[in-house]
Amino acid sequence: MNLMFMMLIIMLINLGISFYNARSAGQVWAESKAIGGWLRLLVWCGAIQAAIGFTMVYLIIVSYIAVSVGYISPQLMGVLFNLVYLMIIVPVIGTGIIITIQSWIAVARERSLMNIGTAGWNTFATAYNTYNAIQSFGPALSSVQEGLSGLFDEDSDSDNSTYRVILLAAIVLLAGVVTTSVIIRRYAASLPVSEEVRNAGLRDLSTR
């Protein structure tokens, strides 16, 4: 019960951060497209971070439903998590580094408590994600290679299970992208770009 409660809290926090990033990106999406440059890059980073966050929430929900109804085995749920992890970890680290650089630029321009806190969190999150990737990428890749070996076997049951894992991974990734796109379109051009935004970019994006 406690584990489920903690997982629910984490999912809600992830949803909140993802929605915030998607909305922030949407508010200046059209303007950043016109301005281009560093601001446009930051907006894309925010959108990618949002899509990844939504994807992870959908992954948890879909994987547990899939196991509960017998669509995939509990063992393949781990393979599914590792497959999605391999797909998102490079974008997570890449966008996190860019957002972290911007957050420290914001601190250099204005030493406020909020800017320092945001920069500190982004630095910690990016460092943790990078360290975790170094430790986890190899085992995750091995798990996926072993779990998806059914693609090359003559066992039809194994082959079907493999395709199911790939299908679920594609579904949750697509759902994360679509959710982000809908939010961006909903809030597009709802916030004028001030001179401060042109100079500083999206200083309040949060990485994960």
Identify the residue ranges that each predicted region occupies.
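Short, Lys/Arg-enriched, disordered terminal segments
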Residues: M1-L3, T207-R208
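Alpha-helical transmembrane segments and immediately adjacent membrane-interfacial amphipathic helices
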Residues: N2-Q27, R40-G70, Q75-G150, D159-A189
